Curated annotation (Swiss-Prot):
Compartments it resides in: Lysosome; Apical cell membrane; Cytoplasmic vesicle, Secretory vesicle, Chromaffin granule; Secreted, Extracellular space
Site description Cleavage, residues in chain: F106, H107, E108, L112, E113, V114
Organism: Sus scrofa
Protein's name according to its UniProt entry: Procathepsin L
A single Gene Ontology CC term: lysosome
Gene: CTSL
Annotated residues for binding of Zn(2+) 2: E163, E199
Length: 334
């Protein structure tokens, strides 16, 4: 995100007329601020409160409709409550939607049958949910997640890998640190570099350091390249079932996703082409007794465990590539 964009949005808010606030929400506002450690200047407090109230009322309306069966998922107030949707998209979503296919191609014809449900968390392939903070580094978290899974598949050891290593060091491959990147570029960096450090040795800072401090002796992963999956959900399903967790990009720019809490996420406005957020598919499944209905992808996000379904989201599966989940899927080869 460019700081000037944030400042512009902020200044526009401050310059507007003083908003009329709902005093009935005072206690909720003070509790939310305390929970998330928010401190504002005198001029900013009213504007942020107004944004928060607008988001709160939108969430309440959605959940009323959810209780009436009009939606398949619920929403909840969270750490993004004082952000406009425009700010949210600028700060949190850092996938660069300009994929240049350079990897091998996944051959789905070699896979005949797959299970009706898969969850690689149950097999030890997936680390705990992480938090990218206010840095557009989603691509790095998606990439480490896929590489962590493949290294576990190869070695039987699950080691948390360093997103900061990717943020600091993969600019020559085309990534832009906190201003966005591509998972395939990250996989290419690991191959070119000959390794990727552990999270423990190269901890995440949530900002750019303008200095690459990779230490070969602390490397815990390597790859030989990457595989791009054909842009079909059936191909993605076969890859998830047979390979492990898969890096994908989605359209995550909607308020409904910003405040997602539980259930199967489906928003008719979600695009299959305008992708802005890198995440990790760790499995798939279905709700109820009919495996042909209420199907979902199990998606690991990088906004902390308090967001959504303990840091995850169930995304509608086999609904015309909803939110573009199969548009830019890939995984590293190790």
């Amino acid at each position: 995100m460019k700081p000037s964009l944030f400042l512009t949005a902020l200044c526009l808010g401050i310059a507007s007329a003083a908003p009329k606030l709902d005093q009935n929400l005072d206690a909720d506002w003070y509790k939310w601020k305390a929970t998330h450690g928010r401190l504002y200047g005198m001029n900013e407090e009213g504007w942020r409160r107004a944004v928060w109230e607008k988001n709160m009322k939108m969430i309440e309306l959605h959940n009323q409709e959810y209780s009436q069966g009009k939606h398949g998922f619920s929403m909840a107030m969270n750490a993004f409550g004082d952000m406009t949707n425009e700010e949210f998209r600028q700060v949190m979503n850092g996938f660069q939607n300009q994929k240049h296919k350079k990897g091998k191609v996944f051959h789905e014809s070699l896979v005949l049958e797959v299970p009706k449900s898969v969850d690689w968390r149950e097999k030890g392939y997936v680390t705990a949910v992480k938090n990218q903070g206010q840095c557009g580094s989603c691509w790095a978290f998606s990439a480490t997640g896929a590489l962590e899974g493949q290294m576990f598949r190869k070695t039987g050891k699950l080691v948390s890998l360093s997103e900061q290593n990717l943020v600091d060091c993969s600019r020559p491959q085309g990534n832009q640190g906190c201003n966005g990147g591509l998972m395939d570029n990250a996989f290419q960096y690991v191959k070119d570099n000959g390794g990727l450090d552990t999270e423990e040795s190269y901890p995440y800072l949530g900002r750019e350091t303008n200095s690459c401090t990779y230490k070969p002796e602390c490397s815990a992963a390597n790859d030989t390249g990457f595989v791009d999956i054909p842009q079909r959900e059936k191909a993605l399903m076969k890859a998830v079932a047979t390979v492990g967790p898969i890096s994908v990009a989605i359209d995550a720019g909607h308020s409904s996703f910003q405040f997602y809490k539980s259930g199967i996420y489906y928003d008719p406005d979600c695009s299959s082409k305008d992708l802005d957020h890198g995440v990790l598919v760790v499995g798939y499944g279905f709700e109820g007794t009919d495996s042909n209905s209420s199907k979902f992808w199990i998606v690991k996000n990088s906004w902390g465990p308090e967001w959504g379904w303990n840091g995850y989201v169930k995304m509608a599966k086999d609904q015309n590539n909803h939110c573009g989940i199969s548009t830019a899927a890939s995984y590293p080869t190790v």
